[in-house]
Structure formats: C-alpha cells, structure tokens
C-alpha cells in the first residue's frame, strides 16, 4: 500500500476551491484565499494540495504507530460519508450530536457505552421476552438514542490519538476538548472558519457533498495505508507463506449448525488473526471454529457474510474493519 494520491483536478471537480460569500469570511483565513468571484471567495488550491498531503501523512503515521483515528462530522452532508469511511478503515466516528465531555469526561462516556452494550445484550437475547411490550419499546428507544451518539465509538476502548473534523465551526466543542487533551486535530477549514489550534489544517469547502466524500475517502485510504505499514513494521510478512490449496472439510468434521454455518477453510500454516484490531486469542479461536484461518479468507467475504461472522464471534461492529484490514494485508502480499 501507499499514501493515497489525488490531483488538483479532482479537487476542482469536487468543488473544494469554493469558499463562502465574501462578507461571511474569517480574516484569519486570508492567506489561504486566492481571490473572490461573484462575491464568493476562492480557496487557493496550490496551498490545499500540500497541506492535504501533510494531513494524510499524519493520519497514516498515527495508525502505523498503533494509534486510533476518530472521524467527526455531524452536519447532514457529512454524516453518511464519515460513518462509511470510518467503518471501511476500522476506525471510529461521531456523526450525530457531539456529547459534551466525549473526550474530556471519558469515564462518564464509558459508563454510557456500557449501558448501550447491556441494552444490546438484553434486546438481542431471550431475556427480552421477560419484559412487556411497552417495556421493550422503552428499552429500544433508549438503546437507539445511545447508539446514535455513541455507536461509532463504543469499540474505541479509550481516547483517540488523532481526530479528523469536517467543519470546525460546527465541531468547535470537539476541537476544544481535543486541544485540552493535546490530541492532534486534522480538519477541513473553510473561509468562514478560524484556523487557530488546528494541527493539520486543510483549506477547503466543508459544505459540498462531493468534496466531503473525497476528503473522507482519502483519509480512510491513509488509515488503511497506516494499517499496512504497521503490519510490515511488526515483521509480519504476508507473502512469506504460500496460500495452501483449498480443501473441503469432510462432512463428519463440519461444525455444528449455528446461525452461520462456517467456511470450508483450508488448513496448513494459519495466519496470526490476532493482528486484526480487537481480535484476542479467544476471538481467533472462534474464527478458527468457523473455518477461518487466513487473511485472504476474510478479504474475500461479502458484507452480509462478514457481518454474520462478526455476530458469531461477538463483535459485529468490527466486521467491516476486519475485511478492510485483511484486504490491505493481502494487497501488500500481492
């Protein structure tokens, strides 16, 4: 893998150069403004290109060192792109309302995450039948409310090592919390925003859907590059062992029927699946019980199958991330 490439043409086509109306500008952004056209400020992409590359490098370096990246974008245009990019790169996100203290009061937030996990267990188990229909509805509403705010960080396990922000004006509380904890901030900064305190500033349009999609895609790919580098730095050589011939398990050895029937996985020298984010020895054994012994097996899974496997091993929210990591590692081997 390598750091994602992009061109100025891509930025132009996505509308990254369009700022806000000239009367809405923040004078602190003057050095990043090329000029004005029809009372709209035009961002200087000659500066955006190297600054965006710098931000991508910072993201990749953070992940390569084992760090976590938190995507933050709660405005309507950013919600879907932020969530998709974070899931695709096995990272974390906040795309609904930012709860004050999400970073600075992590202990309290952790308590709410535990409550969310408990509600998930209750509502997805036979214990739910012990409640009346009205009680189940109340629990479901509480669970949905918590999931909107915390679903993207419930597996984070601690503070992030870097946050990526769309719209610094709207996410000012998140940025203040990160600054207070000395957490680096990479952010898209429009002409109406204050660049002060942003570690990795990227001048650009923070409203256009195409621009936001481009930013999120590039950051996600930078994360995957970091994951790939981390695997290489750990001395793990994906190409060191040749993938064995795939064999079907004898019928007698087939695993007991469950919600997911398991794969007819090959045997031979197994990959160390514990290199995947959040996979312990116990989870690795569950993978093996389902017939999964190699990264290429995960890389070839479709989304539905991956989620079924995630449910079987008890970490459904990790499924997309595992597939992304596995694809990165198999691509490195090729």
From Swiss-Prot:
A Pfam entry, by short name: Ribosomal_S2
One GO BP: translation
SUPFAM superfamilies referenced in this protein's UniProt entry, alphabetically: Ribosomal protein S2 (SSF52313)
Cellular component terms (Gene Ontology): cytosolic small ribosomal subunit
PROSITE patterns for the chain: RIBOSOMAL_S2_1, RIBOSOMAL_S2_2
GO MF, one example: structural constituent of ribosome
InterPro entries assigned: Ribosomal_uS2 (IPR001865), Ribosomal_uS2_bac/mit/plastid (IPR005706), Ribosomal_uS2_CS (IPR018130), Ribosomal_uS2_flav_dom_sf (IPR023591)
Annotated keywords: Ribonucleoprotein, Ribosomal protein
UniProt similarity note: Belongs to the universal ribosomal protein uS2 family.
NCBIfam families xref list: PRK12311.1 (NF008966), rpsB_bact (TIGR01011)
Protein name: Small ribosomal subunit protein uS2
Source organism of this protein record: Rhodopseudomonas palustris (strain BisB18)
Lineage of the species this protein comes from: Bacteria, Pseudomonadati, Pseudomonadota, Alphaproteobacteria, Hyphomicrobiales
């Amino acid at each position: 893998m390598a750091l994602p490439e992009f061109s100025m043409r891509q930025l132009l086509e996505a509308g990254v150069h369009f700022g806000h109306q000239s009367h809405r500008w923040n004078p602190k952004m003057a050095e990043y403004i090329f000029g004005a056209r029809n009372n709209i400020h035009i961002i200087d992409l000659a500066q955006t290109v190297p600054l965006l590359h710098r931000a991508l490098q910072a993201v990749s370096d953070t992940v390569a060192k084992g760090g976590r990246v938190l995507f933050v974008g709660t405005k309507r245009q950013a919600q879907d792109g932020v969530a998709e990019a974070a899931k695709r790169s096995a990272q974390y996100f906040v795309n609904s309302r930012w709860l004050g203290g999400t970073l600075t009061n992590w202990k309290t937030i952790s308590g709410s995450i535990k409550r969310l996990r408990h509600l998930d267990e209750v509502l997805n188990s036979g214990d739910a039948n012990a409640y009346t229909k009205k009680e189940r509805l109340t629990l479901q509403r509480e669970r949905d409310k918590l999931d909107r705010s915390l679903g993207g960080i419930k597996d984070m396990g601690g503070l992030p090592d870097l946050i990526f922000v769309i719209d610094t004006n709207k996410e000012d509380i998140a940025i203040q919390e990160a600054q207070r904890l000395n957490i680096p901030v990479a952010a898209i900064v429009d002409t109406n925003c204050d660049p002060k305190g942003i570690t990795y500033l990227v001048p650009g349009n923070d409203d256009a859907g195409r621009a936001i999609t481009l930013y999120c895609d590039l950051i996600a790919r930078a994360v995957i590059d970091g994951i790939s580098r981390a695997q290489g730095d750990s001395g793990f050589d994906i190409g060191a062992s040749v993938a064995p011939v795939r064999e079907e398990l004898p019928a007698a050895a087939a695993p007991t029927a469950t919600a997911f029937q398991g794969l007819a996985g090959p045997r031979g020298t197994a990959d160390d699946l514990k290199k995947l984010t959040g996979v312990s020895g116990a989870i690795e054994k569950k993978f093996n019980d389902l017939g999964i012994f190699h990264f290429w097996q995960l890389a070839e899974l479709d989304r539905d199958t991956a989620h079924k496997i995630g449910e079987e091993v008890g970490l459904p929210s990790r499924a997309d991330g595992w597939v992304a990591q596995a694809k990165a590692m198999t691509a490195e081997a090729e």
